[in-house]
C-alpha cells in the first residue's frame, strides 16, 4: 500500500500540533476537505480468493483495490484445468502473468517463467484495451527473437541464454512497462465485467 500523500501527512501533523498548543487546525494549516482525504487514503487490499462467485468479487471493487480483486479472479482461474479455460479466461491469466513476472524481474523473467503466454500476450493486451503495453511487449519479444513455431521450452531456453547485449536492450522496455502507459488493472477489470458470462470461477 502506498504511503499517505506528503501534503496530507503534514496537514495531520499540524492538526496535532495545534491541538497540543490549544489552537485550532485553521490557525496553522490549510483546510483539508473530505475529498482531499478520500483521494489520499487507498482502499484495502483483498487478501486472495476465498471461494466467492465472480459477481461477488466484482461487487467488492467498491470496497477493495481493483488490482487485488483482479488478482483474486486470477487465483480462482488458476485452480481450473487448462483445457477447461475459455478464451476470455486465458486472456485474464496471460495479462496477470505478464504483470506479475515483469514487475518482479522484467520481461526476461516473464519469458523464462511464463513461456506459454508469449505467443498470445500481445493480442491479449490489445483485446483488453492496452495498446501501448502491447507495443512495448511486442518490442521486448522482438529482442528475444520469438518465432511463431517456438515451443514453450524453446522460449524458456532462449530467455535463459539471452546475451548481455540482449538484456541491455530489454531494459528500456522494462522501464516503459513500469511507467504503466495503460491502466492495466482497470482495463482488465472492465474486460472481466464485459465477458462475465464466459468467466466461471
Please place each PLM-identified region on the residue numbering.
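Bacterial N-terminal signal peptides that target proteins for export
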Residues: 1-8
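Bacterial N-terminal signal peptides
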Residues: 9-18
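Bacterial signal peptide processing site
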Residues: 21-24
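Extended, alpha-helix-rich binding/interface surfaces that flank or overlap catalytic cores
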Residues: 32-104, 108-118, 124-201
Amino acid at each position: 500500500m502506498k504511503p499517505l500523500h506528503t501534503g496530507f501527512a503534514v496537514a495531520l501533523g499540524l492538526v496535532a500540533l495545534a491541538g497540543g498548543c490549544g489552537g485550532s487546525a485553521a490557525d496553522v494549516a490549510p483546510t483539508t476537505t473530505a475529498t482531499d482525504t478520500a483521494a489520499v487514503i487507498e482502499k484495502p487490499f483483498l487478501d486472495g480468493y476465498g471461494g466467492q462467485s465472480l459477481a461477488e468479487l466484482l461487487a467488492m471493487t467498491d470496497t477493495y483495490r481493483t488490482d487485488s480483486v483482479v488478482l483474486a479472479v486470477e487465483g480462482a482461474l488458476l485452480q481450473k484445468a487448462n483445457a477447461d479455460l475459455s478464451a476470455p479466461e486465458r486472456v485474464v491469466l496471460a495479462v496477470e502473468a505478464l504483470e506479475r513476472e515483469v514487475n518482479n524481474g522484467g520481461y526476461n523473467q516473464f519469458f523464462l517463467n511464463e513461456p506459454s503466454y508469449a505467443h498470445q500476450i500481445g493480442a491479449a493486451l490489445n483485446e483488453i484495451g492496452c495498446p501501448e503495453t502491447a507495443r512495448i511487449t511486442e518490442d521486448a519479444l522482438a529482442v528475444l527473437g520469438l518465432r511463431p513455431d517456438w515451443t514453450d521450452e524453446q522460449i524458456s531456453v532462449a530467455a535463459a541464454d539471452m546475451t548481455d547485449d540482449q538484456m541491455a536492450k530489454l531494459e528500456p522496455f522494462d522501464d516503459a512497462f513500469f511507467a504503466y502507459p495503460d491502466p492495466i488493472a482497470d482495463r482488465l477489470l472492465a474486460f472481466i465485467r464485459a465477458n462475465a458470462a464466459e468467466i466461471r470461477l
